[in-house]
UniProtKB/Swiss-Prot annotation:
It comes from Geobacillus kaustophilus (strain HTA426). Pfam families: SspN. It is found in: Spore core. Residues 1-12 have a biased composition (Basic residues). InterPro entries: SASP_SspN. This is Small, acid-soluble spore protein N. The gene is sspN. Disulfide bonds: none annotated.
Length: 47
């Protein structure tokens, strides 16, 4: 089956977790690679 849109590369699924994300707008890379740092916890409700 041919792709009618032509110049498409092989389809790469863009689901969450399939590709490493660079940090910038999306902080996924920072959260995964903490290198010994504690995660920053933002408290939204008093507990």
């Amino acid at each position: 089956m041919s792709n009618p849109k032509g110049s498409r590369k092989h389809f790469v699924p863009n689901h969450i977790g399939t590709q490493p994300r660079a940090a910038g707008g999306n902080k996924g890379k920072q959260m995964q690679d903490q290198s010994g740092q504690h995660a920053q916890v933002i408290q939204t409700k008093g507990e």
